[in-house]
Amino acid sequence: MEQNSYVIIDETGIHARPATMLVQTASKFDSDIQLEYNGKKVNLKSIMGVMSLGVGKDAEITIYADGSDESDAIQAISDVLSKEGLTK
């Protein structure tokens, strides 16, 4: 299992467009990928799960990946978070 933590810097947090990009990216991998915020974990392959967390600015999130392609999954998700302006 691999994990990485991030602080969200976008003024509106994880809103619909970047959430969609995260879900699409996570769905490309076989690994089980979870997003944790405020003690609650959701499947990062579920748009409803991601949006239900209401992740705002300055929130600390952790991404967990467990499976055969976990390293690639964490890297790809990190790239999306950065590209979408959610993290530095």
UniProtKB/Swiss-Prot annotation:
- Kindly give the PROSITE patterns that the UniProt entry links to this protein: PTS_HPR_DOM, PTS_HPR_HIS, PTS_HPR_SER
Q: Which UniProt keywords apply?
A: Cytoplasm, Phosphoprotein, Phosphotransferase system, Sugar transport, Transcription, Transcription regulation, Transport
GO BP, sorted A to Z = phosphoenolpyruvate-dependent sugar phosphotransferase system
What positions are modified (Phosphoserine)? S46
InterPro entries assigned to the protein according to its UniProt record, in alphabetical order: HPr, HPr-like, HPr-like_sf, PTS_HPr_His_P_site, PTS_HPr_Ser_P_site
In terms of CDD domains, this protein maps to:
PTS-HPr_like
How is it regulated at the activity level?
Phosphorylation on Ser-46 inhibits the phosphoryl transfer from enzyme I to HPr.
Q: Which residues form the active site?
A: H15 (pros-phosphohistidine intermediate)
State the similarity comment: Belongs to the HPr family.
Q: What is this protein called?
A: Phosphocarrier protein HPr
Q: Which organism is it from?
A: Staphylococcus aureus
Where is the organism placed in the taxonomic lineage, from the top?
Bacteria, Bacillati, Bacillota, Bacilli, Bacillales
